[in-house]
C-alpha cells in the first residue's frame, strides 16, 4: 500500500477552448438567434437584430454563458474607452496649443481642434489667444494634464500611443477570456474574492499609485509652473523619481526618505501632504498637496477594506452571513435571500451599481465647481458649465438605467417561490401604499412649487411687487440650507487640526478667490429664488422616481394585468381582447421616466447656469469690485416663470442666435439642427401605427405597379419601436439644443 500525502486542492476556475473562433459565424447577421439568422422577411428584422444583439438573456438561458458574454463585452468596452482616450491625447499632441496655454493659462484659451478650409469652414477657428486659431475646447483635459504634470506635447504623444497599446490588449483579453480561457460560473459568483481585488487592487493600489505619482511627479512640476518657470526648463518626470535631491530642494523632508514613516514621525511629511482646505490663490484649484494627501488616505481605507472579506484563508466576513444577519424588529426575514439574488441575477446587481454610480456622478457634478480640483479650471467658465451639465446628464441616464434593469430583474430573474417575507417581498406587498403616498407627494409638490411661481407672475403682472415672494417682499429664505452653509463656514479650526479654510468657498465666510482678474469662486448666497427652484427640483425628481418605481414594483403583476410577468419586459398591450391595457409594460415606464429625467436635469442645469453667471462668475477690478456676467439678476428675475423665459432663455439665447458669421456659428447651426431633431421626435410620439401601415401599403402598391417592389416586405414601426425612436430623438435633440445654447453663450461672454 502506497501512502500519498493529500494533494493540495486547486479549484479549476476556467474552461479551456470552450468556443471556437469563427469569422464565418460572426459575419452572419443574427448568428445568435435561430429566427433572426434566417434572414429578413420584413423590415422588422433589422429592428429585432439591433434589439437582441446585446440581449444575452435571449441568446441562452445558461447563466455561465451569459456571464462570459458580459465579461468579454466589458473588455470590448474598455478597449473603446482606451481608443477614445488615445484620440483625446493625440489631439492634444498634434492639433493643440497646450504648450502655449501652459505658459499663460489666464490669457490663452484651450484649443485642440483646427478646422481645415474646404468651403469656408475655417471661420470656426476662433482666436483663442497667443496667436493660435482653433476651436475652443471645454472638456477640461488641459487642466487635468497640467495637474498630472504633463509639460510637453511629446509626453501627450507617448501617452496616446500607450493608450492604443492598452486598447489592443483589451481587445485581445476580450477574445481570450471567451474563446481560450473562459471563467466558470463559480468564479463570477465568488464575491469575496471580487471585493478583495476591486477594493484593495483597483481602488486601493490605484489610489496609492496615483498618490505616489502626485507626490513624486505632479507636485514638484506644478510647484515650478506656479512659480513661473518655463515648462522647457523643468526637469522631466523620471528625473524627479530617480534623483531624490531634486525633490529635497523643493521639500526638504524628502532628504530623510522613509525614515519618518517607520519612526511614526509623520508630521515631517506635512510639506507635501497637507490639510489646508480652500483653494490655491495662484491657480484657483484645490491645493494639489491636499489632493495627494486625500488619495493616500483613500488608498489606506480601501487597502484595509479589501482585506475584510473571507477568501482562501478562513478569516474575515462572508457577504452572505452579513446579509442574513441584517434583521430588524419590523423587517421579517430581512436581507435573507438577497445574496442569492445578487449572485444569480446580473440585472439586479447592475441595477444597484447603476443607482450608486448615477448618484455618485451627480455628486461629482456638484463638486467639480464647488471644489474645482484642477489648476485654472475654476476660471474657465465654459469648461465649468460643460462639466456640470455633462455629469448631470450622465447621472440622470444611469439612474433611469438602474430602474430599467431592476424591472428586467423582476420580470426575468425574480423567483417568487423562494421569496417569502424578506425585504423585497415586504416592499412588493405594500407597493400600493408606497406608490399612492409618492403620488400624493408629487401632487403636493407640483401644485405648491408651481403655485408659488404662478402667484409671483400674477402679482408681477398686476404691478404688486410688495405681494410677491422675493428677498425684498415676502421672504421665503432657505433657512436650513443657510444653516448648513454656516456650519461648514465655521468648521475650519474646529474639525481638523491645521485646516485653514473650509472645504469649499461656496459655504461662505471666506474671501473670494480671483485668478487673472476673473472670479474663481466666492461664497454663494442662497435666497427666496433658490428656495422656489429647489422645490421644482424636488417635484421633478419625485415624479421621475414615481414613474420608475411604479414600473419596478408592478413589473410582474398589477390589478389590471395579474399575469404581467408572462408578457415580458416590453409589450404594447395585453392582447386585442382587453381595452385599456396599453403602455403598462415595465419598458413603457422606463420610456416615460426618461422624459421626466430630462425635465428634472434641464431645470438643474438651467438653475446652475444662471445662478453662476449672476452670483459667482465675473471680473474683478483693481479696486476689488466684482462685476458679475448678468449682474446678480437671478434673485429678482428667476422668481417668476416670465423671468425664466425673458431673462434666461430669451436674453441668453442672443449669442447662439446671432452666432452666424462668427467662429461660434457651428453652435448656431447645431441649435437649429437640434431643434429639428427634437421636433422630428414628435412625429413618432404623436402618431398611430395603423396610419403608417396604411400609407406603406399604398406605397408598396405603387412599387408593385412599376415592378420595383423589394423582396423584403416593408412594415410600419411597431408601437414600441415608434416610442423608442421618439424618445431617442427627443432626448438627443433636447440635449444638443441645450449644449449649443450654453456653449455659444458662455464662450462669448465668459
UniProtKB/Swiss-Prot annotation:
The record ties this protein, via InterPro entries, to: PSI_PsaA, PSI_PsaA/B, PSI_PsaA/B_CS, PSI_PsaA/B_sf
Q: Which residues bind chlorophyll a'?
A: 675
Q: Which residues bind phylloquinone?
A: 692
Subcellular localization: Plastid, Chloroplast thylakoid membrane
The membrane topology noted for this protein in its Swiss-Prot or TrEMBL record is: Multi-pass membrane protein
Keyword Chloroplast applies: yes
The signal peptide annotation in the UniProt record is: none
**UniProt GO BP:** photosynthesis
An example Gene Ontology molecular-function term: electron transfer activity
State where it is primarily located.
Answer: plastid
Record-stated family? Belongs to the PsaA/PsaB family.
Q: What is this protein called?
A: Photosystem I P700 chlorophyll a apoprotein A1
Task: Provide the species name.
Answer: Arabidopsis thaliana (Mouse-ear cress)
- Lineage summary: Eukaryota, Viridiplantae, Streptophyta, Embryophyta, Tracheophyta
Q: Which gene encodes it?
A: psaA
Amino acid at each position: 500500500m502506497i501512502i500519498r500525502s493529500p494533494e493540495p486542492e486547486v479549484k479549476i476556475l476556467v474552461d479551456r477552448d470552450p468556443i471556437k473562433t469563427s469569422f464565418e459565424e460572426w459575419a452572419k447577421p443574427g448568428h445568435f438567434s435561430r429566427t433572426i439568422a434566417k434572414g429578413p422577411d420584413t423590415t422588422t428584422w433589422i429592428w429585432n437584430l439591433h434589439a437582441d444583439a446585446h440581449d444575452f438573456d435571449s441568446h441562452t438561458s445558461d447563466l455561465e454563458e451569459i456571464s462570459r458574454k458580459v465579461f468579454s463585452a466589458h473588455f470590448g468596452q474598455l478597449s473603446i474607452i482606451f481608443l477614445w482616450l488615445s484620440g483625446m491625447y493625440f489631439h492634444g499632441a498634434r492639433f493643440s496649443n497646450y504648450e502655449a496655454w501652459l505658459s499663460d493659462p489666464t490669457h490663452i484659451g484651450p484649443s485642440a481642434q483646427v478646422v481645415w478650409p474646404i468651403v469656408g469652414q475655417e471661420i470656426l477657428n476662433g482666436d483663442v489667444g497667443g496667436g493660435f486659431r482653433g476651436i475652443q475646447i471645454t472638456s477640461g483635459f488641459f487642466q487635468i494634464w497640467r495637474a498630472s504634470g504633463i509639460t510637453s506635447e511629446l509626453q501627450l504623444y507617448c501617452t496616446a500611443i500607450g493608450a492604443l497599446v492598452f486598447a489592443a490588449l483589451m481587445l485581445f483579453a476580450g477574445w481570450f477570456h471567451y474563446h481560450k480561457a473562459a471563467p466558470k460560473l463559480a468564479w463570477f459568483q465568488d464575491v469575496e474574492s471580487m471585493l478583495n481585488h476591486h477594493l484593495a487592487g483597483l481602488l486601493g493600489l490605484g489610489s496609492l499609485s496615483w498618490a505616489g505619482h502626485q507626490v513624486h511627479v505632479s507636485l514638484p512640476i506644478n510647484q515650478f509652473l506656479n512659480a513661473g518657470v518655463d515648462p522647457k526648463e523643468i526637469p522631466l518626470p523620471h528625473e524627479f523619481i530617480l534623483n531624490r535631491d531634486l525633490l529635497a530642494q523643493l521639500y526638504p523632508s524628502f532628504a530623510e526618505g522613509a525614515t519618518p514613516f517607520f519612526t511614526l514621525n509623520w508630521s515631517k511629511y506635512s510639506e507635501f501632504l497637507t490639510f489646508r482646505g480652500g483653494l490655491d490663490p495662484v491657480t484657483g484649484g484645490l491645493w494639489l498637496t491636499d489632493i495627494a494627501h486625500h488619495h493616500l488616505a483613500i488608498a489606506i481605507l480601501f487597502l484595509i477594506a479589501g482585506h475584510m472579506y473571507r477568501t482562501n484563508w478562513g478569516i474575515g466576513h462572508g457577504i452572505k452571513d452579513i446579509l442574513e444577519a441584517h434583521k430588524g424588529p419590523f423587517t421579517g426575514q430581512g436581507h435573507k435571500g438577497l445574496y442569492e439574488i445578487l449572485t444569480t441575477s446580473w440585472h439586479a446587481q447592475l441595477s444597484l451599481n447603476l443607482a450608486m454610480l448615477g448618484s455618485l456622478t451627480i455628486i461629482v457634478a456638484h463638486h467639480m465647481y464647488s471644489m474645482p480640483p484642477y489648476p485654472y479650471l475654476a476660471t474657465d467658465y465654459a469648461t465649468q458649465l460643460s462639466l456640470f451639465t455633462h455629469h448631470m446628464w450622465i447621472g440622470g441616464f444611469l439612474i433611469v438605467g438602474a430602474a430599467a434593469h431592476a424591472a428586467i430583474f423582476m420580470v426575468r430573474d425574480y423567483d417568487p417561490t423562494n421569496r417569502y417575507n424578506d425585504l423585497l417581498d415586504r416592499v412588493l406587498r405594500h407597493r400600493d401604499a408606497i406608490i399612492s403616498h409618492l403620488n400624493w407627494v408629487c401632487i403636493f409638490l407640483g401644485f405648491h412649487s408651481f403655485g408659488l411661481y404662478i402667484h409671483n407672475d400674477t402679482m408681477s403682472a398686476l404691478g404688486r411687487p410688495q405681494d410677491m415672494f422675493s428677498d425684498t417682499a415676502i421672504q421665503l429664505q432657505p433657512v436650513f440650507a443657510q444653516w448648513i452653509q454656516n456650519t461648514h463656514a465655521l468648521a475650519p479650526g474646529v474639525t481638523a487640526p491645521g485646516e485653514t479654510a473650509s472645504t469649499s468657498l461656496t459655504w461662505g465666510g471666506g474671501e473670494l478667490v480671483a485668478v487673472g482678474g476673473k472670479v474663481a469662486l466666492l461664497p454663494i448666497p442662497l435666497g427666496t429664488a433658490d428656495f422656489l427652484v429647489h422645490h421644482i427640483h424636488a417635484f421633478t425628481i419625485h415624479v421621475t422616481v414615481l414613474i420608475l418605481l411604479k414600473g419596478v414594483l408592478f413589473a410582474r403583476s398589477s390589478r389590471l394585468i395579474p399575469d404581467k410577468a408572462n408578457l415580458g419586459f416590453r409589450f404594447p398591450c395585453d392582447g386585442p381582447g382587453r381595452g385599456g391595457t396599453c403602455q403598462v409594460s415595465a419598458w413603457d415606464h422606463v420610456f416615460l421616466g426618461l422624459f421626466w429625467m430630462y425635465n428634472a436635469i434641464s431645470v438643474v442645469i438651467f438653475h446652475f447656469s444662471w445662478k453662476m453667471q449672476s452670483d459667482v462668475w465675473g471680473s474683478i477690478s483693481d479696486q476689488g469690485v466684482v462685476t458679475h456676467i448678468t449682474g446678480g439678476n437671478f434673485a429678482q428675475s428667476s422668481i417668476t416663470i416670465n423671468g425664466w423665459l425673458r431673462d434666461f432663455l430669451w436674453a441668453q439665447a442672443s449669442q447662439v442666435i446671432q452666432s452666424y458669421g462668427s467662429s461660434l456659428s457651428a453652435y448656431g447651426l447645431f441649435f437649429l439642427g437640434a431643434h429639428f431633431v427634437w421636433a422630428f421626435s414628435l412625429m413618432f410620439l404623436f402618431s398611430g401605427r395603423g396610419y403608417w401601415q396604411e400609407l406603406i401599403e399604398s406605397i408598396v402598391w405603387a412599387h408593385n405597379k412599376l415592378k420595383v417592389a423589394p423582396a423584403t416586405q416593408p412594415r410600419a414601426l411597431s408601437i414600441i419601436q415608434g416610442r423608442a425612436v421618439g424618445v431617442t430623438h427627443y432626448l438627443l435633440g433636447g440635449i444638443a439644443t441645450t449644449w449649443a445654447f450654453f456653449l455659444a453663450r458662455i464662450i462669448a461672454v465668459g
